[in-house]
Swiss-Prot record:
Originating species: Escherichia phage T7
Main subcellular localisation: virion
Assembly with partners or alone: Interacts with head-to-tail connector protein gp8, the tail component gp11, and the fiber protein gp17.
Stated name of the protein: Tail tubular protein gp12
Annotated localization: Virion
GO biological-process terms attached to the record: symbiont genome ejection through host cell envelope, short tail mechanism
Job of this protein: Structural component of the short non-contractile tail. The tail complex is involved in viral genome delivery. Forms the end of the tail, including the canonical tube, the nozzle, and the small extensions below the fibers. Once the tail tubular structure is formed, the interface between gp11 and gp12 generates the proper environment to interact with the six gp17 trimers.
GO CC terms: virus tail, tube
Keyword list, A-Z: Viral genome ejection through host cell envelope, Viral penetration into host cytoplasm, Viral short tail ejection system, Viral tail protein, Viral tail tube protein, Virion, Virus entry into host cell
Amino acid sequence: MALISQSIKNLKGGISQQPDILRYPDQGSRQVNGWSSETEGLQKRPPLVFLNTLGDNGALGQAPYIHLINRDEHEQYYAVFTGSGIRVFDLSGNEKQVRYPNGSNYIKTANPRNDLRMVTVADYTFIVNRNVVAQKNTKSVNLPNYNPNQDGLINVRGGQYGRELIVHINGKDVAKYKIPDGSQPEHVNNTDAQWLAEELAKQMRTNLSDWTVNVGQGFIHVTAPSGQQIDSFTTKDGYADQLINPVTHYAQSFSKLPPNAPNGYMVKIVGDASKSADQYYVRYDAERKVWTETLGWNTEDQVLWETMPHALVRAADGNFDFKWLEWSPKSCGDVDTNPWPSFVGSSINDVFFFRNRLGFLSGENIILSRTAKYFNFYPASIANLSDDDPIDVAVSTNRIAILKYAVPFSEELLIWSDEAQFVLTASGTLTSKSVELNLTTQFDVQDRARPFGIGRNVYFASPRSSFTSIHRYYAVQDVSSVKNAEDITSHVPNYIPNGVFSICGSGTENFCSVLSHGDPSKIFMYKFLYLNEELRQQSWSHWDFGENVQVLACQSISSDMYVILRNEFNTFLARISFTKNAIDLQGEPYRAFMDMKIRYTIPSGTYNDDTFTTSIHIPTIYGANFGRGKITVLEPDGKITVFEQPTAGWNSDPWLRLSGNLEGRMVYIGFNINFVYEFSKFLIKQTADDGSTSTEDIGRLQLRRAWVNYENSGTFDIYVENQSSNWKYTMAGARLGSNTLRAGRLNLGTGQYRFPVVGNAKFNTVYILSDETTPLNIIGCGWEGNYLRRSSGI
């Protein structure tokens, strides 16, 4: 029997649900309210700092959709969509007024988490209700001065000697003029275009007594009286219409139009059948003396704004307006040449912003607005394509692929359906000609939680029978066009229950957070670290805020996480700061690890001279009620007083009674955090040069003792369980006799704590527990025992 030992360098690997013989040495069985720091080791998670009470338990609805608005460092808000309305809070918990100039029907829903999607661009938060069908306005419009079959033009270009000009309207000649043969010098005047126009108009006025005939620069405008119309309109000039030609509201080509025309006169350019150009409409602008492309006649040109995505807009007064958006109408073409975007007549599933275009997902289509014109989904011209025209493309796959989410990713747009992923990209400028949409991968995706991008990775949820897997989507190194995904929960397959509704995280602190209504009191944390494109750390654990608590949101800005949570009485906003060695509150003697931590000045009138106690009323401190948890009061000199939860809960006896007269004193109050870390079984493990781990599974390991290495740590307890026997060992922080030990101050210890562990290693359970307010940093651990093996391996 040989006495052996093994050291484990760190405990940064989180937990694993694999059998103990398959785990890495740095992985444990359970980690609650811990933080796996790649530099400081295993720590207590940062504390919740109380910011404000947002209302009672139901103030934000049953299952609200909560969106973080991060405009800049001074304008940061939580927008809460309750299902019946919107509430906006800044990140100090102060509520902003939300006005509804067009009502709030668009965001009314029984399930806002499932039905609402949104994206923020500057002061605008664009909001989509996936249950609302975008509809067109069925009212047809006509621009002013359009008189179908009532008027027409004669384009007069000039004359040619000896030619006869004839104007024929409704079956009769209304003007006829023979140009002289040019034998006399004065005949040149008879070939002048304007002279010919006046001559023909004079005859037309005589032959069409009730009609209006006007002459312009190079044209004649004839208008039928009320009750009559132009049924036929032709001209003859003996020169193939090169001298004069009729211009009704239809023309074969743009070259047939006169240089000038009455203001607002409209013509449809039918086009040459031998050319691929679409038909289009032009209208004369007399002020600018040009023909401009315009909207056709009897055309539906507008969507119903009330059925389109709305916006929550930050106003100049600091409050918010929820309102319709003024979506641009069509400016050219008709229903055939300028069709409706594919989202009209369908519901919109997501809204996004990509390459300076606002985009929608609807059915199997991706629709992008014109460049920098976010409310315009129609081309500026039918006759000429432009690089800034809108884009409307559909995915191509043999399966039905209803698109659910779009996430900008590595200069591309990653698009998700329930079972497949697509990438929209373009070489160079993104235009309707250069756009490419390709199927890249096929992974199942959970619809309720939006995929979230952190760095060069996108994290998404894949549901299984009872639990959810989280995948990391990435571009393969050196081959950016090749995409893949890996299951980062493969070693904890039964950890996150189904019902995931939020995936967030921070690229600053390298973590991803997951919320699930299957276990609403927890934040599931994935801590990772990549160095030179290699994964150096992946750690799963969870933060537990108590079974009576629901976490509604936990989104991050830089190194701060802002958490909205509620207990059975009230709803709160709190902050978690990941900054190392941070002092959360001014005057705090040290960073106290307490949840809902608050600085409080004890008011006068709270001291009772008879009992020599100062009584603090918990609802007065927070403006809210609490039911469960151990409370600690920390004084500026480091003295702490711990209050156990009353049997019936704090709501039955909401008073903290402190010894002595503390009126006017500043104290720090909060709920203790229960940190738990359970080690994997202490087994003999070998790590190869390639990083793989093998476990000695032959023989018997009889443990004798174990140790943990700690740094700048307060007190913690170690529990050892060996079947029916249980032991508890306490590390009290700084040791007696230490030069750094001072009365009335924070005393932290650094060193190694050794404790007995006896029995077969396969049956020992060892875990650390700490609910004190002091820090905890476990760097590594190790064990010592007798190893007996009957045979030698080969």
